[in-house]
């Protein structure tokens, strides 16, 4: 049977038509044609059919697990380009199960070094746009202060693949403060992972830190080969297979905001059109999660109470709902939308207090505010729940509210009372220096590694 019309539509850029025709072709061939499977998932991606892409790519990947692991990972990686609804928890669990089956048994006879002297960091790339690059640099420099040598091994998972067929590395000329080994992009995902694992073994590592989970298939596949005596997962919590790791630490919170504020020329209130502001608050992060929340009600109340108070928003997301609400409250003229910013360090100097949005936490931006010594007002939720992440990070009782009205009261007190604001800033900064300063990152991970060694 000929599928020329389907491929012609794809070639001509009619992705909607191509995806419909290629779906039929894939069904008719039982999802066994490499050419059609690739074209079908490409058409879905180009057409923006994210749910369907996640489902189709997962189905294809699962069918290849036993016969072609490299291609299976390729399609699982495509599935992650789909929406969270398409790749649901059940599918995530299934992928984790597959990686567990691929995981090599732990060599209990292998000697674990004490003290640790050499560690490997496995990361997708060291691109400037990749937040993990800054995190790896913080950890490597912290470990170096304790006499521990680091080497970064990139996987370059997004190069020479699917929508990015170019064979060039995405890693840029960034200095993580240690040696960097950039992965070759030759071969399939399985072959690429095997080479990286062999390089880590040859390096003579004591510990390997993996800075990504299942969303970077090659990175997790490297872990399944167990190239290090102790393996630490240091990526986003809940996004990996547990089997290959001795420590599921996740990315322990830390911020290099102090260094970034020194490196970025500071904005001024005059330069931002805030000359008339008596005080300024801010909220940074994914603004899509702000609209319609009780947080907006609290912000509107604060702005109404203090006619010379201004507020800054920075981040991605549709702000129509935010603007509409604040316009209805009559306070929109004193709100500035800065859009998506690669780094908020330059505007931290104009901020007096940081208002953490709720219920959705904004860990990275909030931690930057804490590190900049800004009093952060946050809402408490039951301990251990995801929504309580903001409160747990702030950790200063006087800044934590148990209800929306109290949230507003705390913010208003800080706006009104400079002395209270300075006292809160000192408390927040002291907590940051003790718990989240980059220099503390290495020792925090090493304590977890030591627990593994003692139980070996």
Give the location of each predicted region.
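Active-site donor-binding acidic/aromatic loop of nucleotide-activated sugar
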Residues: 332-341, 358
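Active-site-proximal region of nucleotide-activated glycan assembly enzymes
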Residues: 77, 81-90, 226-266
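C-terminal alpha-helical cap of glycosyltransferases
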Residues: 438-456
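Short acidic alpha-helix that forms the nucleotide-activated donor recognition element
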Residues: 195-198, 203, 340-352, 371
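Conserved catalytic-core segment of nucleotide-activated headgroup transferases in glycan assembly
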Residues: 132-142, 256-328, 334-337
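N-terminal subdomain of nucleotide-sugar transferases
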Residues: 76-172, 176-178
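Catalytic binding pocket for nucleotide-activated donors in carbohydrate/polymer assembly enzymes
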Residues: 353, 357-422, 426-432
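Short N-terminal targeting/anchoring amphipathic segment
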Residues: 200-215
């Amino acid at each position: 049977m000929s599928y020329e019309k389907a491929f012609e539509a794809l070639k001509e850029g009619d992705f909607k038509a191509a995806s419909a025709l290629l779906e039929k072709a894939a069904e008719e061939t039982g999802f066994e044609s490499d050419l059609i499977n690739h074209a079908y998932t490409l058409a879905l991606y180009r057409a923006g059919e994210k749910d369907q892409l996640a489902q189709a790519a997962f189905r294809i990947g699962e069918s290849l697990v036993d016969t072609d692991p490299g291609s299976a990972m390729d399609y699982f990686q495509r599935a992650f380009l789909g929406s969270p609804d398409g790749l649901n928890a059940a599918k995530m669990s299934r992928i984790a199960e597959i990686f567990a089956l691929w995981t090599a048994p732990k060599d209990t006879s292998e000697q674990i070094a004490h003290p640790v002297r050499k560690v490997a960091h496995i990361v997708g790339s060291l691109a400037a746009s990749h937040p993990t690059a800054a995190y790896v640099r913080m950890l490597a420099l912290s470990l170096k202060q304790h006499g521990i040598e680091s080497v970064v091994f990139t996987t370059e998972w997004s190069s020479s693949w699917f929508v990015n067929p170019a064979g060039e590395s995405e890693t840029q000329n960034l200095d993580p403060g240690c040696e960097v080994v950039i992965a070759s992009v030759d071969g399939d995902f399985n072959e690429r992972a095997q080479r990286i694992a062999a390089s880590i073994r040859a390096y003579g590592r004591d510990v390997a830190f993996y800075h990504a989970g299942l969303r970077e298939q090659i990175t997790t596949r490297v872990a399944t080969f167990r190239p290090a005596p102790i393996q630490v997962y240091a990526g986003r919590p809940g996004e990996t297979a547990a089997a290959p790791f001795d420590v599921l630490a996740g990315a322990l919170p830390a911020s290099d905001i102090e260094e970034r504020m020194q490196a970025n020329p500071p904005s001024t209130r005059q330069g931002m059109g805030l000359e008339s502001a008596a005080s300024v608050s801010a909220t940074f992060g994914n603004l899509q999660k702000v609209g319609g929340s009780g947080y907006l009600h609290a912000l509107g109340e604060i702005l109404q109470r203090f006619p010379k108070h201004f507020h800054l928003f920075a981040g991605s997301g549709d702000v129509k709902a935010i603007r509409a609400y604040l316009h209805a409250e009559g306070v929109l003229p004193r709100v500035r939308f800065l859009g998506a910013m690669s780094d908020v360090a330059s505007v931290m100097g104009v901020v007096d207090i940081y208002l953490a949005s709720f219920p959705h936490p904004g860990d990275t931006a909030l931690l930057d505010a804490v590190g900049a010594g800004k009093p952060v007002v946050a809402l408490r939720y039951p301990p251990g729940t995801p929504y309580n992440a903001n409160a747990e990070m702030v950790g200063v009782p006087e800044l934590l509210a148990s209800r929306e009205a109290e949230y507003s009261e705390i913010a208003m007190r800080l706006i009104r009372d400079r002395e209270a604001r300075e006292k809160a800033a000192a408390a927040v900064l002291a907590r940051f220096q003790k718990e989240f300063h980059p220099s503390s990152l290495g020792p925090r991970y090493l304590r977890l590694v030591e627990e593994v060694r003692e139980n070996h």
